Amino acid sequence: MSLPQSYRKITFADIALDDVARVDTFETLVDFVANYPSPDQKGLYIYGDMGVGKSFMLAAMAHELSEVATTIIHYPSFTIDVKNGIKDGSVKEQIDAVKEAEVLVLDDIGAEQFSSWIRDDVLQVILQYRMIEELPTFFTSNYSFADLEAKLSNGRQGDETWQAKRVMERIRFLAKEVHLKGVNRR
């Protein structure tokens, strides 16, 4: 299990269920853990405002799956690491480690410094592999599917709608979109 230190002890028991909007998402995650591994299992794309508990819930799921190689990646930090990996030739190794995780959580997707290279040669490669191998993939974001697609379409070359659609098609295949509402719990 590859989890940030602050997430390692979070369990389902730590999740506040005082808001009905959180219960459905929580129950979906509990079902995922109870039925893992199952070939029909799809990940979640949980989006919402900052501090509502998106990352917290997925950290609890990862902890509950501690026997499984679950990896949580803060996606903006990962993209910086990949860019820095160009110097030492570790880009492929870094991408392979993420794309091959048994269960993957891409945390805070859309918050990274956007570039066409990251979208097409990093994110799309990871998602394509996970789609073909049918590996469970979860996402957190402040962006809905539609908003993330719009963000991914704006490249240096102008309109890159088709490239963004390719990425979003893979995300939609891998995960069900869920809007998590609530108060900021930080």
What are the functions of these language-model segments?
Residues 1-13:
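Conserved ASCE P-loop NTPase core motifs with emphasis on AAA+ ATPases
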Residues 11-44:
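Pre-Walker A (pre-P-loop) alpha-helix and adjacent loop at the N terminus of AAA/AAA+ ATPase modules
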Residues 23-27, 62, 66-101, 116, ...:
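Short glycine-rich substrate-engagement loop in P-loop NTPases that contacts/grips substrate
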Residues 38-58:
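Walker A/P-loop nucleotide-binding motif
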Residues 39-40, 98-101, 132-134:
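Short loop/turn elements that form and flank the Walker-type P-loop nucleotide-binding site
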Residues 104-105:
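Walker B beta-strand of ABC/ABC-like P-loop ATPase nucleotide-binding domains
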Residues 108-109:
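Walker B catalytic acidic pair
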